Regions:
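Glycan-recognition surfaces in beta-rich domains, encompassing non-catalytic CBMs
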Residues: 281-406
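Mature catalytic domains of secreted/periplasmic carbohydrate-active enzymes
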Residues: 1-286
Length: 406
């Protein structure tokens, strides 16, 4: 039952917007749970959240044929402003069902599921004479989020009549220009083994690792995370500066990857000097370009994820399932593939299907010592073209770390 006439009308309005405009994303500036109340208005939104989300997803599933291409964001899912204080066991479930959004806060480490940070260029509502965040600060926040499995919502503060200051416009132009130059390290990029530090930020995509060097110099730069001993990095074959594809001299050793960027050059079209002279992105090619368990295109039903495992898993994360019937699905172009998973962490059976047909099973046996990055299945030769690969839990504990595509 609804909490108030206001909540009743709100529900109808949201339903009307979903059906009429078919949005890809709905943002709610309110808490998902019922133990925090925004602005002192007890309208019952927390108790309506399951109904709103279910309605949004069910309608979208019919429109997108079950591809789950929509997202809803709410606040107060765990963290400092947790709105599930009355039922904390719900946080883990809700975290997988929507994207949690928080003002001015970036998660401290890589997260298993996506999150959003909200930042404003100035105040949320225009203040005459107020100071602006720099383009450099916005890019720093953006890449910190992307590297930890998050995204950034940027509020461009407007005057009451809808226009923006020239300063705000230039900041947006600088941010947009930097993203345009380095977009392959941003759009659809996924977290690497580690997110980085105050000097370098990592992302990955399409078999490449990207390192954002915040303060480049002509002195050698050492990146320990990309050493020859890393569980997620193979033999590095090429390093290039993304903005001009210039080859960067490098040496990979057990201590790390040493780069010689040379004298920093100013990026064209950016007025913010710190951003124009710094924040250089390098593209790193290596021979361990596996498809990770959370790469774009993966569709799951019932599976859970762990990240920051620090146990030797590829990209330091893992997808796993404890429930029969759970499915992990992806469509890839491959003539042959191998499944990488830890052997020994649990006991269960996983069925492998290609284009809907049974091609084999993987048996996981509990062992005293877990062998990470084990090849647990290799397919026979497939016809040329794209194939749907599906992993189905038949019983017990099963997992996937990566797929090697041939």
């Amino acid at each position: 039952s609804l909490e108030s006439p206001f909540a009743n009308q709100f529900m109808w309005r949201v339903d009307d917007a979903i059906r009429k405009y078919q949005p890809d994303m709905i943002y709610f500036d309110d808490h998902a749970g019922d133990s925090q109340v925004d602005l002192g208005i007890d309208m019952g939104l927390g108790k309506l959240t399951p109904q709103i989300i279910a309605n949004f997803y069910n309608i979208a599933d019919k429109r997108t044929e079950g591809r789950k291409e929509v997202v809803a964001t709410f606040k107060g899912v765990g963290g400092r402003y947790n709105s599930f204080q009355r039922n904390p066991e719900m946080v883990g479930i809700v975290d997988r069902s929507l994207v949690k959004s928080t003002e001015l806060y970036t998660e401290d480490d890589i997260m298993a599921f996506p999150f959003q940070t909200e930042v404003s260029l100035q105040e949320w509502h225009y203040q005459k004479g107020g100071s602006y965040r720099s383009a450099e600060e916005i890019i720093t926040r953006l890449m910190q989020n992307v590297s930890r499995n998050g995204c950034l919502l940027l509020n461009v503060t407007q005057h009451g009549r809808g226009n923006i200051d020239d300063e705000a416009r230039q900041i947006c132009l600088d941010v947009g220009r930097w993203i345009d130059i380095n977009q392959e390290a941003v759009y659809s990029a996924r977290p690497f083994d580690v997110w980085g530090n105050n000097d370098v930020i990592y992302t990955r995509q399409g078999g490449h690792i990207y390192a954002v060097i915040l303060h480049p110099s002509s002195d050698p730069i050492v990146l320990p995370a990309l050493s020859s001993q890393s569980a997620s990095v193979g033999k590095i074959t090429k390093v290039e500066l993304v903005e001009n594809n210039r080859a960067v001299p490098f040496i990979q050793s057990a201590e790390g990857l040493t780069l010689q960027l040379g004298e920093p050059l100013r990026s064209e079209g950016i007025q913010d000097m710190k951003l124009a002279m710094g924040y250089k992105v390098v593209r790193i090619s290596h021979d361990k370009a596996w498809f990770n368990d959370d790469d774009p295109g993966v569709r799951t039903f019932g599976w859970d994820r762990r990240c920051n495992t620090h146990e030797g898993d590829f990209n330091n994360d893992l997808s796993f399932s404890n429930q029969a019937g759970d499915t992990w699905t992806v469509t890839l172009e491959a003539r042959k593939f191998s499944i990488i998973a830890p052997q020994g962490m649990g006991q269960g059976t996983m069925e492998v299907l290609v284009d809907g047909k049974h091609v084999g099973e993987v048996s996981f046996v509990k062992q005293r010592e877990v062998k990470h990055q084990s090849v647990v299945f290799t397919s026979k030769k497939l016809r040329k073209g794209k194939h749907e690969i599906q992993l189905k839990n038949k019983n017990g504990m099963v997992a996937i770390d990566a797929i090697i595509i041939q």
